[in-house]
Amino acid sequence: VYKRQPLFHAGAYYVQEASSMFLEQAIKAYVKEPVRCLDLCAAPGGKSTHLASLLPDGSLLVSNEVIRSRSYVPAENIAKWGRPDTIVINNDPEEIGEALPHLFDVIVTDVPCSGEGMFRKDTDSTGEWSVDNVRLCASRGRRIIHDIWNALKPGGILIYSTCTYNTEEDEENIHYIIEELGAEALPIPTQEEWQITGALRFEHPVYRFFP
């Protein structure tokens, strides 16, 4: 229904799931001054428009989508948003990591996943799920983080998220980032009434949103 409203097409608002909006809590907790921020897997652009509204004045937001055919969607949404401090690019994470070492203060990685969080909205997606696909997505998530890690400034913030529930793509990949790349997992302030679930494996601060 909202897609018929002129204000939506004018960029006055963008509709997201509550779990996607949790990005705001991480930014507010750790970003206090202008930064260079990369939204690595940006399509369709909801997180980029949210970041554009959240980042302190004077920040630069780079919105990247690896798949060229999908990159036009965030470009359109960001153009509607009307922020001049946002750039849309179409590059592989490895290319960015090699070309822009230690450039970004913040990198947001909402990595491609097996999509278990979509089952309640799209019943057809259950037929695409398999154990092999979970393993493939978990491996791809690690590769994406490994490839982009060099672009993160020492002491910078990397936000890792998925729209799936299994521990292989979530807790195990976070554990990989900590153990193999030397990251520190930081807590994000929450409230009890939000009913957020913690980690199912390991003891790292993890935030799960179940329907």
Task: Indicate residue ranges for each PLM-predicted region.
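S-adenosylmethionine
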Residues: 3-211
